Amino acid sequence: MTPHEYLSQLLASQEMRDPDLRVIRSLRDELAAFLGRQLGSGPRIYYGGSYGKHTMIREAYDLDLVVYFPPTDARSLAEIFGAVHQALVRGKYVVEPQTVALRLPYEAGFHVDVVPGRALESDFLYATLYKNSNPPSTLKTSLKVHIDAVRKTELRQIVRLLKLWRLRHGIPLKTFALEILAARALAGRRPDDYGTAMWKIFQYMAKEMATVRLQDPANTNNVLDLTVQERSSVAQAAAKSLSAQTWGEILW
């Protein structure tokens, strides 16, 4: 069996089951309907994250919902963030505020991240998010650009493999960073052979992770803040994978 065949089998084993997808869609519909009643018809609600990018793996997934208010909404971003937070609390949801999201925890570690923002234009392509940090700030980005960055570069399956690799090796790195690393390592090459593509990514991580600057493809002014520990963990795991004798030691 070739590395590509082995990795293809792993990907097949991580496909989402129809019952799980139905639960996710039902939950999205429930939240969208609730927020529509609470917030009115102005905001648009989109799938974000792994569902929007089609990069879910069965063993570890969650749901991102983006709530973009129209550019005509005169409230501050802090007020918009607060309005969505208050609406969820009124609905008896358990809410854990994150940096740009309102996290709703469910069973078995599953959660929904609700991300409020305000669109910059009427096309809703770009939006500004509120950063719930100290001090508070804002972040301009684009969900649609992030989705296209994965879909149009055909990185979907590679990202799924990297998410499984992260899970197996306990690597503390967000999926968004993995997506950018994959795109940077492959530099426009089509990932037709999964083994070759993953090997190139591991080589790039092992060599460049200590100093690489990861920029948001939707806004190069947004640079991902990676800790020394995160950089070191990724580089060490990549080097370990490169020294493995079989793919079964790297991904299973």
Model regions and ranges:
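Conserved catalytic core of two-metal-ion nucleotidyltransferases
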Residues: 59, 81-123
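Short, compositionally biased low-complexity segments
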Residues: 1-12, 55-60, 127-139, 175-177, ...
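Short beta-strand
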Residues: 45, 94-97, 175
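N-terminal regions immediately upstream of nucleotidyltransferase
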Residues: 1-46, 50-58, 73-76
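Catalytic metal-binding acidic patch
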Residues: 54-77, 81-84
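Generic non-transmembrane alpha-helical segments
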Residues: 30-41, 83-91, 161, 165, ...
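A structural motif
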Residues: 115, 121-162
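Conserved nucleotidyltransferase catalytic core and NTase-mimicking acidic/glycine-rich helix/loop elements
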Residues: 154-252
